[in-house]
Amino acid sequence: MFKILKQVGDYAKDAAQAAKYIGQGLSVTFDHMRRRPVTVQYPYEKLIPSERFRGRIHFEFDKCIACEVCVRVCPINLPVVDWEFDKSIKKKTLKHYSIDFGVCIFCGNCVEYCPTNCLSMTEEYELATYDRHELNYDNVALGRLPYKVTQDPMVTPLRELAYLPQGVIDPHDLPQGSQRAGEHPEDILERLQAEKQQETADQ
């Protein structure tokens, strides 16, 4: 009799322990189910880089004085500055400037120490190419302004992983209505069109 009761008690204990383990596993599953999706459907969705994102370097040819400070502060002496001395004005004249982004580590030293602010970091990160030599940007390619993600009506910009409310480090607990801090591209276009029509009507 006592043996049967002991077996029943052990069975109940094992069943309770199994239910506990199942509950722990399901709690993790349900926790992930209530979270918002973190998968980015690239290239139809793109993350908006943060304000201090260090992307492709933008170069302004007219501001450069060929001082070569960027070359001296670069850990790998990467920028190629081609200049000649103009005896008539007794100054250096810049002829060519290039940076190989296949080697660049995007440390930002050149931007920080440039005395004329002719270098700046952009939010452009799509530098993939089939030929590594195409990553060697000359002054013309470096002078091209980047195309912002927020200006592309065919792409949905995802802001929640770049811009979060103060004190929030986990985007999963935000309300469902705050998935995007900004507007959808189609809403932006409609708003701009409405503002343009309003300005036309006021005139």
From Swiss-Prot:
<feature type="binding site">
    <location>
        <position position="114"/>
    </location>
    <ligand>
        <name>[4Fe-4S] cluster 1</name>
    </ligand>
</feature>
<feature type="domain" description="4Fe-4S ferredoxin-type 2">
    <location>
        <begin position="95"/>
        <end position="124"/>
    </location>
</feature>
<keyword id="KW-0479">Metal-binding</keyword>
<keyword id="KW-0411">Iron-sulfur</keyword>
<dbReference type="GO" id="GO:0019684">
    <property type="term" value="P:photosynthesis, light reaction"/>
</dbReference>
<dbReference type="InterPro" id="IPR010226">
    <property type="entry name" value="NADH_quinone_OxRdtase_chainI"/>
</dbReference>
<feature type="binding site">
    <location>
        <position position="67"/>
    </location>
    <ligand>
        <name>[4Fe-4S] cluster 1</name>
    </ligand>
</feature>
<keyword id="KW-0618">Plastoquinone</keyword>
<dbReference type="GO" id="GO:0048038">
    <property type="term" value="F:quinone binding"/>
</dbReference>
<feature type="binding site">
    <location>
        <position position="74"/>
    </location>
    <ligand>
        <name>[4Fe-4S] cluster 2</name>
    </ligand>
</feature>
<dbReference type="GO" id="GO:0051539">
    <property type="term" value="F:4 iron, 4 sulfur cluster binding"/>
</dbReference>
<feature type="binding site">
    <location>
        <position position="64"/>
    </location>
    <ligand>
        <name>[4Fe-4S] cluster 1</name>
    </ligand>
</feature>
<keyword id="KW-1278">Translocase</keyword>
<feature type="domain" description="4Fe-4S ferredoxin-type 1">
    <location>
        <begin position="55"/>
        <end position="84"/>
    </location>
</feature>
<dbReference type="GO" id="GO:0008137">
    <property type="term" value="F:NADH dehydrogenase (ubiquinone) activity"/>
</dbReference>
<comment type="subunit">
    <text>NDH-1 is composed of at least 11 different subunits.</text>
</comment>
<dbReference type="InterPro" id="IPR017896">
    <property type="entry name" value="4Fe4S_Fe-S-bd"/>
</dbReference>
<keyword id="KW-0793">Thylakoid</keyword>
<feature type="binding site">
    <location>
        <position position="110"/>
    </location>
    <ligand>
        <name>[4Fe-4S] cluster 2</name>
    </ligand>
</feature>
<feature type="binding site">
    <location>
        <position position="107"/>
    </location>
    <ligand>
        <name>[4Fe-4S] cluster 2</name>
    </ligand>
</feature>
<dbReference type="GO" id="GO:0031676">
    <property type="term" value="C:plasma membrane-derived thylakoid membrane"/>
</dbReference>
<keyword id="KW-0520">NAD</keyword>
<keyword id="KW-0677">Repeat</keyword>
<keyword id="KW-0472">Membrane</keyword>
<comment type="function">
    <text>NDH-1 shuttles electrons from an unknown electron donor, via FMN and iron-sulfur (Fe-S) centers, to quinones in the respiratory and/or the photosynthetic chain. The immediate electron acceptor for the enzyme in this species is believed to be plastoquinone. Couples the redox reaction to proton translocation, and thus conserves the redox energy in a proton gradient.</text>
</comment>
<comment type="similarity">
    <text>Belongs to the complex I 23 kDa subunit family.</text>
</comment>
<feature type="binding site">
    <location>
        <position position="104"/>
    </location>
    <ligand>
        <name>[4Fe-4S] cluster 2</name>
    </ligand>
</feature>
<dbReference type="InterPro" id="IPR004497">
    <property type="entry name" value="NDHI"/>
</dbReference>
<dbReference type="Pfam" id="PF12838">
    <property type="entry name" value="Fer4_7"/>
</dbReference>
<feature type="binding site">
    <location>
        <position position="70"/>
    </location>
    <ligand>
        <name>[4Fe-4S] cluster 1</name>
    </ligand>
</feature>
<keyword id="KW-0004">4Fe-4S</keyword>
<keyword id="KW-0874">Quinone</keyword>
<dbReference type="GO" id="GO:0005506">
    <property type="term" value="F:iron ion binding"/>
</dbReference>
<keyword id="KW-0408">Iron</keyword>
<keyword id="KW-0521">NADP</keyword>
<dbReference type="InterPro" id="IPR017900">
    <property type="entry name" value="4Fe4S_Fe_S_CS"/>
</dbReference>
<protein>
    <recommendedName>
        <fullName>NAD(P)H-quinone oxidoreductase subunit I</fullName>
        <ecNumber>7.1.1.-</ecNumber>
    </recommendedName>
</protein>
